[in-house]
């Protein structure tokens, strides 16, 4: 039997076998056995080395025609098998389209967003404006304009993510004090603003620390602003946030950009000041830092510190939310666990 006859015989057997194939695995096996690298056609074509130059094109064309014919019938058979499998599945499986589908999880505003909006609403009612700032900040505004010149020892209080020697991720929202004072026209009146936003520190993440968290900076600058104005403002805000029965305690502290500086404590809202695990049995909870704007900060913004004065404060959104809702791990705010978040819907 010559090569032409062998190819024709292989063609007939292959197409005959193709008609009886009933599943995709058998179909693929047939293609491999007949046309694969070690298949029958390959073995037949090894004999082409013995053909004359005139015979080789004829046998080659015959082999290619066989491959093309088989390829077309193979694809048609494959579609036929797939359709048969689908039809069988439709007959054997039932679907009740009247059954309710899986309910989608209901979204809601994040608890930190809710906290921020509540604080903003309080200050808007007091005539404050809300300003946004840069999360990528310059060393000049983040430190130097906050009375922290190069090599100032107080810079060690904050571990910083530096991008370049002069560009960094802001460590507090305080740079907005300087930026807002620079842009404000004090000839038209004083300045009252809050600046909410994310800040970054090189902290190790644990239950009470995060490398990223939220602050709300507050600033008031005008003529004749005193510590009494600061105390009255924070007393009003804290009572709106934690209840009218709350008391505030003021302790001397140190911040480079305020003088004098204070730490503000609030009477424990859980035990009423009697002592419990929330207040560590002291009756008081540390809530924020504040103070009168340092004269150097005012002067660097072009203001005469003998004429203008002001106060500033910083609120931590996570801390307020943790205290109000009894949350003991700050990481819950950022892990995206719906079971945690839906508690505050």
Curated annotation (Swiss-Prot):
Classify the main location.
cytoplasm
Q: What CDD domains does UniProt report for this protein, alphabetically?
A: PheRS_alpha_core
Subunit-level organization: Tetramer of two alpha and two beta subunits.
Q: Which HAMAP family match?
A: Phe_tRNA_synth_alpha1 (MF_00281)
Known catalysed reaction(s)? tRNA(Phe) + L-phenylalanine + ATP = L-phenylalanyl-tRNA(Phe) + AMP + diphosphate + H(+)
Q: Its Gene Ontology molecular function terms?
A: ATP binding; catalytic activity, acting on a protein; magnesium ion binding; phenylalanine-tRNA ligase activity; transferase activity; tRNA binding
Q: Which residues are noted in the entry as Mg(2+)-binding?
A: 259
Q: Name one Pfam family in it.
A: tRNA-synt_2d
Q: A GO term (biological process) for this protein?
A: phenylalanyl-tRNA aminoacylation
Q: Which cofactor does it need?
A: Mg(2+)
User: How is this protein named in the record?
Assistant: Phenylalanine--tRNA ligase alpha subunit
**Localization per record:** Cytoplasm
Q: Which residues form a coiled coil?
A: none
- What is the free-text note on the cofactor? Binds 2 magnesium ions per tetramer.
User: Superkingdom of the source?
Assistant: Bacteria
Family the entry assigns: Belongs to the class-II aminoacyl-tRNA synthetase family. Phe-tRNA synthetase alpha subunit type 1 subfamily.
GO CC, sorted alphabetically, is: cytoplasm
Tell me if Transferase is a UniProt keyword of this record. Answer: no
Ordered alphabetically, the record's keywords are: Aminoacyl-tRNA synthetase, ATP-binding, Cytoplasm, Ligase, Magnesium, Metal-binding, Nucleotide-binding, Protein biosynthesis
Entry-linked InterPro entries: aa-tRNA-synth_II, aa-tRNA-synth_II/BPL/LPL, Phe-tRNA-synth_IIc_asu, Phe-tRNA_ligase_II_N, Phe_tRNA_ligase_alpha1_bac, Phenylalanyl-tRNA_Synthase, tRNA-bd_arm
Task: Please state what class of enzyme this protein is.
Answer: ligase
Species for this entry? Lactococcus lactis subsp. cremoris (strain MG1363)
């Amino acid at each position: 039997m010559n090569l032409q006859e062998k190819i024709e015989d292989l063609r007939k057997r292959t197409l005959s076998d193709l008609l009886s194939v009933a599943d995709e695995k058998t179909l693929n096996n047939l293609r491999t056995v007949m046309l694969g690298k070690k298949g029958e056609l390959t073995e037949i074509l090894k004999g082409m080395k013995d053909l004359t130059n005139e015979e080789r094109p004829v046998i080659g064309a015959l082999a290619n025609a066989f491959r093309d014919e088989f390829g077309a019938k193979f694809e048609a058979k494959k579609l036929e098998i797939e359709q048969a499998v689908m039809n069988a599945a439709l007959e054997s499986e039932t679907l009740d389209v009247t059954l309710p589908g899986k309910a989608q999880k209901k979204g809601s505003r994040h608890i930190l967003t809710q906290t921020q909006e509540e604080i903003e609403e309080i200050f808007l009612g007091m005539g404050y404006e809300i300003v946004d700032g840069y999360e990528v900040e310059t060393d000049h505004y983040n430190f130097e304009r906050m009375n922290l010149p190069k090599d100032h020892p107080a810079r060690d209080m904050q571990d910083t993510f530096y991008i370049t020697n002069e560009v960094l991720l802001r460590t507090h929202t305080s740079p907005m004090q300087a930026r807002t004072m620079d842009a404000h026209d004090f000839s038209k009146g004083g300045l009252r603003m809050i600046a909410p936003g994310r800040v970054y520190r090189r902290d190790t993440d644990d239950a009470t620390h995060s490398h990223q968290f939220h602050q709300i900076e507050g600033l008031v600058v005008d003529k004749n602003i005193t510590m009494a104005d600061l105390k009255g403002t924070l007393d009003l805000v804290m009572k709106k946030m934690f209840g009218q029965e709350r008391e505030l305690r003021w302790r001397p502290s140190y911040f480079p950009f305020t003088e004098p500086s204070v730490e503000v404590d609030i009477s424990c809202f859980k035990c009423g000041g009697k002592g419990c695990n929330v207040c560590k049995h002291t009756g008081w909870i540390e809530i924020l830092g504040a103070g009168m704007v340092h004269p150097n900060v005012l002067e660097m913004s072009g203001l005469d510190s003998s004429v203008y004065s002001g106060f500033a404060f910083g609120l931590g959104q996570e801390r307020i939310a943790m205290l109000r809702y009894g949350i003991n791990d700050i990481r819950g705010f950022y892990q995206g666990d719906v079971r945690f978040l839906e508690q505050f819907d």
